[in-house]
Amino acid sequence: NYERRWKVSWFLRESNAMVPAAIAPRLSLDNQPDDFNGKSILVIAEQGVGDQIMFSSILPDLVSRASKVTFVSVPKPMALFKASFPTVDFIPPLPSLRIGAFDKVIALGSLAYAFRNRLEDFPGAPYLRPRDDVIEAWKARLGPKTTRLRVGLSWQGGTDRTSGQKRSI
């Protein structure tokens, strides 16, 4: 139920493994774009890496309004995020994180409520940019570019709790 996602109690119950208990009371889920104007925002990655990559497409919308955006993420996607969104501060989950230093604390997936309500709200443009050294390493590994399309896929979906093995290739 898409609408139910924005109810705080349901959200906290469903994401309790990813949202630290100290942060949960500060979460703001039902924001409008203007609610972020000139504010310092702490974004919590409350979902798996695949969803973080998908919802990170909303970060430029948030950055355009907020005075400062700090994103708490697991280390795995952090290098890609730092290269793609250079004006966002990315930090790993820290037990000593001072959430009181931020005007708002929001779950990454909840940004969709503020910024993605209609098809027209999706920019339809690339938003992930690998680092130059990563591009060069892959060029060296794959060899000269040919006319044939080269595609590689790898995906692991979900967790044991969400039947992830059924959603992986």
Residue map of PLM features:
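Alpha-helical solenoid repeat scaffolds of the TPR/TPR-like class and their adjacent stem/linker regions
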Residues: 1-169
